[in-house]
Amino acid sequence: MQNLLKNLAASLGRKPFVADKQGVYRLTIDKHLVMLAPHGSELVLRTPIDAPMLREGNNVNVTLLRSLMQQALAWAKRYPQTLVLDDCGQLVLEARLRLQELDTHGLQEVINKQLALLEHLIPQLTPFSVASRVGWN
């Protein structure tokens, strides 16, 4: 895994990545946080998503969550990413990759897919974009 991340840093023109105390590598790419962490034989990519529209007070907006989950199912055949709620109830875009089958190019592709999905999801989760879609502007 160290060689994989070393090669990724080089291909991105960055200094070698350094893990935090929990062993998580935190990359900021196009203003998005992408966390990479080894988990057994997998590399887990996680990006927390600020989703103010997902909460209605102390409850979850079930309609929006259902829509997001349907989208995740639709892209599942093309992308390794899925949407999960973490222990705190925060929405996270996550991909689990087998380290044994992963090379630098493959990791870059998955990170690019992660960023593309974020660009698709985030406008759906911000109050301004929801208001403009329903004509409140």
Curated annotation (Swiss-Prot):
GO terms for biological process: protein secretion by the type III secretion system. InterPro entries: T3SS_YscB, Tir_chaperone. Keywords: Cell inner membrane, Cell membrane, Chaperone, Cytoplasm, Membrane, Plasmid. It is a peripheral membrane protein. This is Chaperone protein YscB. Induction: Transcription is induced at 37 degrees Celsius but down-regulated at this temperature by calcium. Interacts with SycN to form a complex which specifically binds to YopN. GO terms for cellular component: cytoplasm; plasma membrane. Functions as a specific chaperone for YopN. It could facilitate the secretion and the subsequent translocation of YopN. It holds the Pfam family CesT. CDD domains: T3SC_IA_YscB_AscB-like. Its main location: cytoplasm. It is found in: Cytoplasm; Cell inner membrane. Transmembrane segments: none annotated.
